[in-house]
Regions:
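Glycine-rich beta-strand-centered segment in the early N-terminal region that forms part
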Residues: 21-38, 50-91
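NAD(P)H dinucleotide-binding glycine-rich loop of Rossmann-like/cofactor-binding domains
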Residues: 36, 45, 83-146
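Short, glycine/polar-rich helix-capping loops at beta-to-alpha or helix-loop-helix junctions
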Residues: 92-95, 171-178, 243-248
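Mid-domain Rossmann-like dinucleotide-binding core that forms the NAD(H)/NADP(H) cofactor-binding site
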Residues: 119, 123-192
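Glycine-rich phosphate-binding loop and adjacent beta-alpha segment
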Residues: 170, 218-289, 322-323
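Short amphipathic alpha-helix with an adjacent loop that forms part of the alpha/beta core around
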Residues: 194-205
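C-terminal capping/lid region of NAD(P)-dependent oxidoreductase domains
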Residues: 282, 287-296, 304-323
Length: 323
């Protein structure tokens, strides 16, 4: 089978497209013929050896796919030929991937594969952050940092479903235009306004109830200063490469909670709640509440380009590769 293989940790251009053996499955696994695989910022970090978890080469990156079950182990009840969304630990950037039966979600055959491969990481993380970490309530205000990225765009769409008002922060006009097309309520440019003062103005002096922060760096403290009393700052990642050093006295005087969001670990410790959330996300798509259309669709041969765009901060919206 064709696969994207990391043979040496480093820049994405070191990745190789190789012919390798199909993975073998154990009694609790399914073999999925991959149609589409989602691409995310952590994939770029993983091949560099800079992610929270370091994997020794050689390995196949990629941990969200949509495809068809071609084979299954004896302990698997899902029928052959079922379309599924899968969340493999690694191995997704390939024509076939073996996944534990507990990490696949059956969907209807007419479920769009592009949407299926886009759903797990970005929408799963955002929904977990808003629903379970922030306990977001309809009518609350939400500041989305890095609003044009995969997490940001998923958050904007889910905020609409959950009845939240969004303030979307971006770094360029083309990103602002894309965010507006997704239904962002208010859009601001980091480089053109004072973040704290602008957010205060947009919330009648109160500040925002919730901040989604996949960016990090100095903007994190600016966002914290823009929160309302008893607000919540949700830390999802550090896309700009800088882990912020925040003045903790702000949490005292503002009563703000700084909450970590590691969706991947939560899926392992809370499988039943994960399944519940996925069922809800799939229903949002099937009912038309969520319209997931990846902005960037690459060929598998161009995976390294897709990952480089994350590192260069050129990525807008959700990225997938068609296998």
């Amino acid at each position: 089978m064709k696969a994207v293989v990391c043979t040496k940790l480093g820049e994405p251009n070191l990745l190789e497209i190789k012919e390798v053996d199909k993975p073998t499955i154990n009694k609790d696994e399914v073999l999925i013929k991959v149609e589409v695989a989602g691409v995310n910022f952590p994939d770029a970090l993983l091949v560099q050896g800079k992610y929270q978890i370091v994997i020794d080469p050689p390995f196949i990156p990629g941990n969200e796919v949509c495809g068809i079950i071609e084979d299954k182990g004896e302990n698997v009840d899902i029928p052959l030929g079922t379309k599924v969304i899968g969340i493999p630990p690694i191995g997704g950037f390939a024509e076939f991937v073996a996944i534990n039966k507990n990490l696949v979600i059956p969907v209807n055959m007419n479920f769009d594969s592009l949407a299926g491969a886009s759903l797990p990481i970005n929408y799963g993380t955002s929904y977990y952050a808003l629903k379970r970490r922030a306990n977001a309530q309809s009518g609350e205000s939400l500041l989305v940092l890095g609003a044009s990225g995969g997490i940001g765009t998923a958050t904007i769409q889910l905020a609409k479903v959950m009845g939240l008002k969004t303030i979307c922060a971006v770094g360029s006009d083309d990103k602002a235009e894309y965010v507006k097309s997704l239904g962002g309520d208010e859009i601001l440019r980091y480089d053109q306004v004072d973040l704290k003062e602008t957010v205060k103005e947009l919330t009648d002096g109160k500040g925002v109830d919730i901040v989604i922060d996949p960016v990090g760096g100095e903007v994190s403290e600016q966002a914290l200063r823009a929160t309302a009393f008893n607000g919540r700052l949700l830390v999802i990642g550090f896309a700009n490469g800088e882990i912020p050093k925040i003045s903790l006295n702000l949490t005292l005087v503002k009563g703000v909670s700084i909450v970590g969001v590691w969706w991947g670990r939560w899926t392992n410790t809370s499988p039943h709640e994960t399944a519940e959330d996925f069922s809800e996300l799939v229903s949002f798509v099937e009912s038309g509440k969520l319209n997931i259309v990846p902005k960037n669709n690459y060929k598998i041969e161009d995976t390294s380009i897709a990952l480089e765009n994350f590192l260069n901060r050129k990525n807008i919206g959700k990225t997938v590769i068609s296998v």
